């Protein structure tokens, strides 16, 4: 995982946060899933995203390890909506600069809050009933004429508009892959890191 969102500049996109240090949001899941990336980059699976979000803390509900969304002083630990209609308790109404909150133990920022993140995993309410028997990832690339239920993709991490529940590393929800939302972004992964053949 890259600590910030990474895309390919040659295609007219950027490979860094905007000039105010905020994460970028992009249109449509399809654009994020391969059409803008060189083959080495892709969206993470839901399992890969959760592994990275936990930062080595296997049973922790949040990337920072604790069971609460606030520290001992009462400060929020991510950019999310702590109470009904309360978007500015952390001093930002929408997306915050990337380094506004501490990274997890892998050095990854905003694995909870700020913007939710697309995964490559297709959303189905019953996926946990069969996915572990078959494979840890459930992928389906919807066709244009497929029904809306087949166009759902898992998003993880919660955003500035979500309550703390959606910021938990084990919480999943969905969005339709052909929609654009100001509160959903992505981070890319590389399929292989290491040396080539000698």
Residue ranges and their predicted role:
Residues 1-7:
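Short amphipathic alpha-helical interaction segments
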Residues 10, 20-169, 195-198:
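Functional-site microenvironments in short loops/helix caps that host divalent-cation chemistry
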Residues 15-16:
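Short beta-strand "wing" residues that participate in macromolecule-binding interfaces
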Residues 182-197:
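Short, structured beta-strand segments at or near domain termini in extracellular proteins/domains
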